[in-house]
Structures are given as structure tokens and as C-alpha cells.
Amino acid sequence: MDGTIENFVIYLHDVKKTSKNTEVSYERDLKKAAAYFKDQGIEDICESSEANLNSYMLYLEREKFAPSTVSRSVAAMRTFFQYLMKEKRIVQDPSEHLHPPKVEKKVPEILTVEEVDLLLSQPDTRTAKGLRDRAMLELLYATGIRVS
């Protein structure tokens, strides 16, 4: 593999300006895929075919990986093979027709009226900080903003 994955991670950082979390996740996903391919007799992940990638996706699903994990792995491989194309390491992108599984979006949990009342009653509105905190809580509640 001659440092190809490591060079890809450097490319993500330096050129794509990705987050550290993306870089760590993609590196882990690609190394896991490389280990799978090695077990299948493919020494270099760069030599993977479309059929190999589909086989790997089925393996992840059989092993009960979450759809979000499989989806991220697809994203990692697609970005990796696009990088290899850009670097002229491969002539055809085997991930071109790779599609991630559908990831169900979770319905956000909402607070009851009683919980909202309790939350809004917490700041001590007799102080400046309490008034500020109450105003922030009211703003968050009124706009429906959420933590992502």
C-alpha cells in the first residue's frame, strides 16, 4: 500500500481542509477495507474492483454495522478513489456506482410543557446573569434551535 492511505489523509487535511474527525474516520474506514481486501487476496486497496467494493459493503451489512457507518465508509472510499484518479494512480474509479444505504433520520425528542416551564424557571431573574440566561433559553426554545 506504500503509504497511499496516509498520503490521502494528508491530502484531505492540506487540500480539502477536512476536520480531524473526518480524517481519522476515513483513515480507519480505509484501513479496515484494506484489511478485508488483503484477506480476499488483494494486497493493494488501489487494485480493488467495483465487485470487490460491493462485496465489502455486503460484508459490512452482514456484520451488522450501522447504516450510518456503512454510508460513511462509502463516502470514504468514493473520496479515496477520486483522489487516486486525480493522482493518476488508477484509470477507472471502481467506486463510481457505489451507493450508500439509506440512513433513517431520527425524530428529535421534544420537551413537554412541564419540562419547558421547569427549564425556563431555573435562571435567577433577579440578577443580570439570570436575566441573560433566561433570555438565551427563551431564544433557543422559540427558534427551535438544536445541538447537532
Predicted segments with their positions:
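Conserved catalytic core of the tyrosine transesterase superfamily
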Residues: 1-148
